[in-house]
Amino acid sequence: MAPDVSPALRAVAQGAAAAGALAAGAALGVFAARSIFRGVTRSASPDVSAVVRGTQRTVLAGDGVLLHVEIDESDVPLTVVFVHGYALTLETFRYQRAAMQGKARLVFFDQRSHGQSGQGEFDSHHIDQLGHDLGLVIDAVAPHGPLVLVGHSMGGMSIMALADQRPDLIARRVFGIALLSTSAGGIHGLHHALPLGLSRAFDVLAPPIAAALAKRKDLVERSRWQDTDLGLLLIRLYSFGSTGTEEGSRFVASMVSSTPVEAIAEFLPALQAHDKRESLGNLEGVDLLVMVGDKDRLTPPDRSVDIVERIPGAEFILVPDSGHMLPIEKHDLVTQALLALLDRARRAAMEHAAGGVA
């Protein structure tokens, strides 16, 4: 018999889902965040005035969903594709975008049902579909030349799905991969993230609760939190491992609040079911960077260690006093590590070309 989610739904509607925000972006907390920060606008996001918007493109996915893509051109013969996470947008990488413009050709896109991309159907909200979408974006806007792939959270899972589906592409063209705050084996067992040992119940109840909330979107959207300071605290708890800044918290909240309720609900089971550990071998031979915050509650460090142990030679950076939103919370460190990866990838691609390998 399926769990009776009615009491839980009522509790969420009354605001009890605030505790779920401690689960680092899992559905219940994201719903709470959406209610708290519905009034937050883009104007509250960090000021990165150096960012110059490049060419905007639309890529048609196999099922007709339109994927929003932005390209910052460069004469450097290397393309870097950035893939954002769950309930976020391509703006996740705005600091890296500002620092890396001109150093490579940069490609950013909103995953389906996120940001400015089109809404997918229920049965398309899974990690394998995101891998197919990523492959189509590469085929459409970067069909030739060496690549570096950068994925944060669910974006890292998308890269793993692509490697599972198209190992030939990885072997031929990808010279660097950065997996930031991600997991090769789902997001189960957040016992340390939820108080009072509630994570087991969360694992069982969250998907049906999320589905019920999606059906009652009007109920969720009407929810309001009057205490904005409390809302900011919750976002800090799930996003940042350090004190963080109110500006950064509002920026994360603005991305969360822009994500459709249906997408938040329907992607959660996919995050829990995700398991690409057996196909990580397809990344061998690629310069791999793995980074995670030591206080990441959604994809804790042991998930990154699991990836590194399966890929000989992978670089592992454990970032102290950091949570799940590394590209924002510790943007300088992330940018520095990515620039070093780009330099290595560029040299490797040049050596590859000089060797006459197709």
Region spans (language model):
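Flexible "cap/lid" loop of the alpha/beta hydrolase fold
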Residues: 164, 168-219
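Short beta-strand/loop motif that positions the catalytic acidic residue
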Residues: 283-284, 290-292, 296
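N-terminal cap/lid segment of alpha/beta-hydrolase-fold proteins
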Residues: 45-67, 71
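Conserved HGGG/HGGXW glycine-rich cap/lid loop of the alpha/beta-hydrolase fold
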Residues: 65, 70-119, 140
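Conserved alpha/beta-hydrolase catalytic His-Asp/Glu region
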Residues: 213-282
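Hydrophobic alpha-helical topogenic segments used for membrane insertion/localization
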Residues: 7-38
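Catalytic active-site module of serine/aspartate enzymes centered on a nucleophile-bearing elbow/loop
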Residues: 312-358
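Active-site loop/oxyanion-hole signature of alpha/beta-hydrolase fold enzymes
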Residues: 113-158, 164, 168-170, 336
